[in-house]
């Protein structure tokens, strides 16, 4: 798996300093086999030293591929996202003793050396902008629940009016009410 690492030693040593980075990645692990990069990931990052912490802001651009939630056909989703984080050196966490440990970790990305791995930040930024349910098209008809045929490619011969045996008694009740 490719990691996105930045050398921040120059920035850490001089308050008020600023540095820009550009990285490109061809693959990324999304913790979930449902998503893969379909296009090279381009990341532009600017980090500035702001006293007790570093400010990081950036932009990413890529496309990811996954499966349609209804018909399971492969779908490519373009992704553009801005992101921002405040970075806090692990040894400086004690300076924020007035905050609970959970609050510090919520507010800051904690790092512990001059090589900053932003892979998790980028991965989370991509996943945050992806739709909950990906469709190949808005009117996707999905798969036949009986035979599994992709209904976007034509109708199947299955009788979908067959009542689930567990609901048969309700169907009979409905029929008697209609009479």
Residue ranges and their predicted role:
Residues 1-179:
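Structured interface patches
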């Amino acid at each position: 798996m490719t990691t996105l690492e930045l050398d921040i030693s120059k920035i850490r040593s001089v308050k008020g300093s600023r540095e820009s980075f550009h990285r490109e990645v061809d693959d990324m692990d999304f913790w979930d086999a449902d998503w893969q990069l379909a296009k090279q990931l381009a990341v532009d990052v600017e980090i500035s030293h702001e006293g007790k912490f570093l400010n990081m802001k950036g932009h990413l651009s890529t496309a990811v591929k996954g499966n349609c939630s209804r018909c399971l056909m492969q779908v490519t989703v373009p992704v553009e996202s801005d992101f921002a984080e405040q970075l806090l050196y692990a040894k400086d966490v004690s300076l924020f003793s007035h905050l609970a440990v959970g609050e510090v970790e919520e507010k800051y990305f904690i790092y512990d050396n001059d090589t900053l791995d932003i892979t998790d930040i980028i991965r989370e930024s991509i996943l945050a902008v992806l739709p909950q349910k990906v469709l190949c098209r808005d009117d996707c008809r999905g798969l036949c629940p009986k035979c599994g045929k992709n209904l976007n490619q034509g109708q199947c011969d299955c009788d979908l009016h067959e009542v689930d045996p567990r609901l048969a008694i309700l169907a009979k009740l409905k029929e008697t009410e209609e009479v």
